[in-house]
């Protein structure tokens, strides 16, 4: 699933995640979040996992930007109107609700998911939220609607002050682990360069 990085891209700090409602308040209360990511994809029957890393940005009013640096350059931009992916200098590919409605609906749902929108979570997942103590928490989501239930067995999130780990367990027995670090909340608005990247055709 080359669109799996989308699952990593809505990230906000959590001061003390005790309830799901608190998660929602924290996730929606940060205008811009930047972080470093490291992703490990473990594929059944492959001897070595696939590793990648880079930088991500989520802007509440603009969308998300996934900027992979290694092992090859890849950018993924998602806003309310389109999803644009460019790999290693190749011409970008654009997905909209018109040319791929199911994929766009899937990605739009993921954006709402990682804002911890309780209504969306309850409509689409069975929820297992736990306060682990010492400021740490876990959230296990089991899909119950299509297309998520056709792709994933569970989505496991964890963290403390910030969302730190994401594990995607898919129906084929493969696993994707994403570690997020170096979170930055400032500047609280997009820089000129970031704004131009979201505005690019």
Set out the residue ranges of the language-model regions.
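An acidic-aromatic
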Residues: 55-108, 176
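Short hydrophobic/aromatic-rich beta-strand segments that constitute the beta-sheet cores
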Residues: 37, 64-68, 83-86, 139-141, ...
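Amphipathic hydrophobic-ligand
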Residues: 48-55
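Short beta-strands and strand-coil junctions in structured, solvent-facing domains, enriched
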Residues: 44, 72-74, 147-148, 187
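Flexible, processing/modification-adjacent segments and terminal tails
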Residues: 18-43, 49, 87-143
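Gly/Pro-enriched, hydrophobic low-complexity segments
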Residues: 118-201
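N-terminal signal peptide c-region/cleavage motif recognized by signal peptidases
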Residues: 11-16
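Positively charged n-region of N-terminal signal peptides that target proteins for export
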Residues: 1-4
